[in-house]
Amino acid sequence: MSPAAIAEAHGDPYVAAIRAVSNGSSSYMNGGAVQGMKRTTFLFDRHLHKDFPVIVRGSGSNLYTKDGRVIFDATSGAAVSCLGHGNKRVTNAVYQQMASGIPYLASGFFGNETVDDLCEELINGTGRKMARVYLTGSGSEAMEATCKLARQYFYEKDKSTPRVNFITREGSYHGNTLGALGMSGHKARRAPYTPFLMPNVHHVSSCNPYRQRLPNESDALFVSRKAAELEAKFQELGPETVIGFCVEPIVGAALGCVAALPGYLKAMRDICHRHGALFILDEVMCGMGRTGTLHAWQSENVAPDLQTIGKGLGGGYQPIAGVLISQKVVNVLYNGTGQFIHGQTYQGMPVQAAAALEVQRIIRQHNVLDNVRIQGAYLGKLLKQHLADHPHVGDIRGKGLFWGIEFVKDKKSKMAFDTKLSVAQRIHDTAISHPYNMTMYPGTGTVDGMCGDHIMLSPNYLVTKEDVEYIVRTAVDVIESVLENL
């Protein structure tokens, strides 16, 4: 995208910040207030021993701290802020909806045109491959709703249905609520809560060529082996007992941007449909444009029966996620009880819909996904160019503006670092501190759900070529600094 196009997409005379690293001319490179300023808070933070930078405002890719630093947001938070921070069009849309006097409506009582317009925008974005949208407040809520909807689909058809089992994958993450966590295959996240998790969720291996490909095994043979494994799991459980198979097309937080190989999604869907089960995609993190198509499945045109969406849906301007529902699922409920036995207070709020609708309109009207593909390819190219030969970089993978780097103690054996070293967390902590001042998303459990380290880079969709070069230059400096001092 040209600078003018970027400015227009931001809704104001925004000019992408020039990251003047080489000559040290930027104020954030020349010091500023003392870091580590103690923060007094009664918030029960997720990390009780950390003193986080206090952010006071944001603009584009920049976050401004209370102590005078400027932090470049190279991860869009958790791959959320897809249009960057402070977008005038989106904030104005939210303001207008608030000013209407109806930021909230009880979704069980009333309809709303803003909500309807958003749902139409989303269904059109699937090429009408999906039929309806169920809106929620978070990705975890969306997965909870998906599990219940999938079960109700079969219950409506036959109240004595034996379909009670889900199949998901090892090394997956589908959310933090008990149902969503039960669907996940990330051992470390599950461990404290195992006694409470659904017992009827069964796992097959992930699709991770870096760690699972056999010697001389082609992509086609690899996919065939994975298909055989899923088929075997259906047979083990009894095909008539399986509700569905749930998969992330590109695994985000749990594995660090590991994409399914070409043909994998179709092979998995074919098995599900052969046995009358539902094919379910979790695109909360990898979807809504993050990988260069609005939905990750569109790159191979493998539409699901149910799909979760979130994060980039509202771009961080409101908490919103949802479930895209195929016509066959809609038909069963429509011709049955006529209702979905589920609901939460803050779902489908007009103010949430206003934010998401404006985000999606900007993406469509300004062909923003062209920039995702162009800058994403450049980001991947530069990462591989500068880090592929590093002795402790095992793999660099990703698509669009969604890239992961996996770290290893030994490149040949692919042995992970000792978990006590907290490699990914060290990289994050170093990156976000002066003089680097950039976010890098840390992840652990990359190898087996317990050990292994990776980081992710997922900048906003409006980044420039110069931004990408700055991201890679900074990431390389941080990684080299941390790894050489372990």
List each model region and its residues:
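Conserved N-terminal phosphate-binding loop of PLP-dependent enzymes in the Aspartate aminotransferase
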Residues: 2-486
